[in-house]
């Protein structure tokens, strides 16, 4: 959605690049694990017909896409066959083999590798600091190892640790 891309890469400076994804009405996330029924999918697809308000492209992120019901997949398939020009669908899943072949054949696939313990720790530290929280380095490394390469898991474990231990007491000994 960058308004001024350089060599195919986002500029990082325009209004679209600086948009807070969590507050954009043109970027919609659906958790398919809790919204797996056909009626929920149809409601989302009806909204896809409308042009984006602020961005060039409306983005629909369907998380845990492998959890969609058969009828929800069929509804999605019709739209994937002839998607509106102003819409991009991102199907995120940890189980691509569980998606129907008819859906997969209409998707461009990107596989993401697990992050290193160092990258997990650094990214989690950045997120925690932006939220005003701190965890000792040893505890953070313990959390990163437990996350097994998954950023979402690392943030979830860190959140649980902060809830259990409290900000100042998040030490490796308490976590173990």
Range-by-range predicted roles:
Residues 1-109:
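P-loop/Walker A NTP-binding region and its immediately flanking N-terminal helices
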Residues 15, 19-25, 56, 92, ...:
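Extended, largely alpha-helical regulatory/partner-binding modules appended to the mid-to-C-terminal parts
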């Amino acid at each position: 959605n960058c308004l001024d891309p350089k060599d195919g890469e986002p500029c990082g400076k325009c209004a679209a690049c600086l948009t807070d994804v969590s507050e954009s009405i043109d970027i919609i996330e659906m958790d398919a694990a809790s919204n797996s029924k056909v009626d929920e999918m149809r409601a989302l697809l009806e909204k896809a017909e409308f042009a984006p308000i602020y961005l060039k492209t409306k983005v629909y992120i369907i998380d845990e896409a492998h959890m969609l019901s058969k009828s929800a997949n069929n509804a999605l398939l019709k739209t994937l066959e002839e998607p509106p020009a102003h819409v991009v669908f991102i199907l995120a899943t940890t189980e691509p083999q569980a998606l129907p072949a008819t859906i997969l054949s209409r998707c461009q696939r990107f596989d993401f590798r697990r992050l290193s313990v160092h990258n997990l720790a650094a990214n989690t530290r950045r997120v925690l600091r932006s939220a005003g929280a701190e965890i000792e380095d040893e505890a953070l490394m313990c959390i990163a190892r437990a996350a097994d390469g998954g950023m979402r898991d690392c943030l979830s474990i860190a959140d649980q640790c902060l809830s259990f231990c409290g900000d100042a007491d998040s030490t490796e000994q308490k976590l173990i």
